[in-house]
């Protein structure tokens, strides 16, 4: 009351109304608002506000790598590129050769000696050590025989997690049996925990995908059969999922997150040239064929036998954007049964949308053990962006 008498022009706005105002502001103004007061920051970083803001987005963009080996930290480049089909591409300045994963607009990049988690929208970058185990130098650190990584979100708690399955062969540790490590990093706390291994051996796996609170890997337990290895990020339990019967090869068989559902994309290249997409019902883990796209006479087929396609996103009208392993981007219109060529030399990372979820205030980087090098401590990196400009024309009581 005394404060209101001293400043009669001030206005007190209840939290619900203030949140509604923030929802209508552009991104730059929201980032500025975080520095105004603790109360505003608390509202803008709340789980409710972050989820409401994401749900209001009308259209997702496409995130592509602007490949650069300069060694600077990854960051989102200003502006965007508009291509055919009314698709918008934003570029992440990074080394495209490094393995990366995305979840809800956050990006996880595996560097040879640490893990970066980046929120491109808030310009926050957090760096973590690899936790348990040994890093075997730059040349072998990302060999599929050694590492199976994943990044996703616990749909119950909302926390983001990095998962590591480390498969070390006999020749590298001189042991009788291979040493297998299963561990999970909580991005919020920066702590690694060991997971219970599955009741079966995990051999060859492919790059992971996250969807609906789980991380999935294509797993080949035998020479002929493929299955999907699933990790529930809340229960932190592993189990197998069967795949639909189809003719597959290691190259053409892909798993993707398509509108927060796990999907399989399989490119047929022999008797017929087509792209089939199957989507999984998460509750009962059954599959439904959602697309069968005829590629014959629609896409240049000079490299047909060594070419496969990966879907990126599906619009509300059912139009699907996909790309091939030669960095060419396409869009399929089911109603017209047409394929539109969008762009070339586009290194697609994932669909992309705004996420204002805050990352922890500090990075946690433990000293990794590197073969042939002393255990020198590594520095902790925290990058937080800020923009300054006027926001409101009236005084607000905080």
Curated annotation (Swiss-Prot):
Residues 8-55 form the F-box domain. SMART domains: FBOX. InterPro entries: F-box-assoc_dom_typ3, F-box-assoc_interact_dom, F-box-like_dom_sf, F-box_dom, Kelch-typ_b-propeller, SCF_F-box_component. Pfam families: F-box, FBA_3. It comes from the Eukaryota. PANTHER family: BNACNNG10540D PROTEIN (PTHR31672), F-BOX PROTEIN CPR30-LIKE (PTHR31672:SF13). This is Putative F-box protein At4g17780. It comes from Arabidopsis thaliana (Mouse-ear cress).
């Amino acid at each position: 009351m005394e404060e209101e008498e001293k400043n009669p022009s001030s206005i007190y706005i209840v939290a619900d109304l203030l949140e509604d105002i923030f929802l209508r502001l552009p991104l730059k103004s929201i980032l500025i608002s975080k520095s105004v007061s603790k109360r505003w920051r608390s509202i803008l970083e709340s789980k409710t506000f972050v989820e409401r803001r994401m749900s209001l987005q009308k259209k997702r963009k496409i995130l592509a790598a602007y490949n650069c080996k300069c060694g600077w930290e990854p960051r989102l480049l200003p502006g965007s590129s508009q291509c055919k089909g009314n698709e918008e591409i934003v570029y992440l300045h990074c080394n495209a050769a490094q393995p990366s994963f995305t979840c809800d607009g956050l990006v996880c990049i595996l560097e040879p000696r640490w893990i970066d988690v980046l929120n491109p929208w808030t310009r926050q970058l957090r760096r973590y050590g690899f936790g348990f185990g040994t890093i075997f130098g730059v040349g072998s650190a990302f060999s599929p025989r050694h590492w199976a990584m994943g990044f996703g979100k616990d749909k119950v708690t909302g926390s983001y997690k990095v998962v590591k399955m480390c498969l070390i062969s006999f020749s590298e540790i001189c042991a009788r049996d291979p040493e297998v490590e299963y561990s999970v990093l909580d991005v919020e706390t920066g702590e690694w925990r060991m997971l219970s291994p599955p009741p079966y051996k995990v051999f060859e796996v492919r790059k992971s995908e996250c969807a609906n609170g789980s991380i999935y890997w294509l797993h080949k337990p035998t020479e002929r059969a493929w299955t999907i290895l699933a990790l529930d990020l809340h229960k932190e339990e592993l189990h197998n999922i069967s795949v639909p019967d189809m003719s597959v090869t290691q190259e053409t068989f892909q798993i993707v997150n398509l509108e927060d559902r796990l999907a399989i994309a399989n490119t047929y290249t022999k008797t017929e040239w087509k792209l089939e997409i199957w989507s999984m019902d998460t509750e009962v883990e059954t599959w439904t064929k959602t697309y069968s796209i005829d590629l014959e006479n629609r896409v240049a087929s000079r490299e047909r036998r060594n070419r496969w396609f990966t879907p990126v996103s599906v619009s509300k009208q059912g139009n699907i954007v996909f790309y091939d392993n030669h960095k060419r981007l396409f869009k399929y219109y089911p109603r017209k049964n047409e394929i539109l060529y969008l762009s070339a030399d586009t290194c697609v990372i994932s669909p992309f949308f705004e996420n204002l979820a805050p990352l922890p205030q500090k990075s946690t980087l433990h000293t990794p053990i590197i073969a042939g090098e002393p255990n020198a401590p590594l520095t902790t990196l925290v990058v937080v962006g800020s923009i300054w400009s006027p926001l409101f024309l009236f005084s607000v009581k905080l």
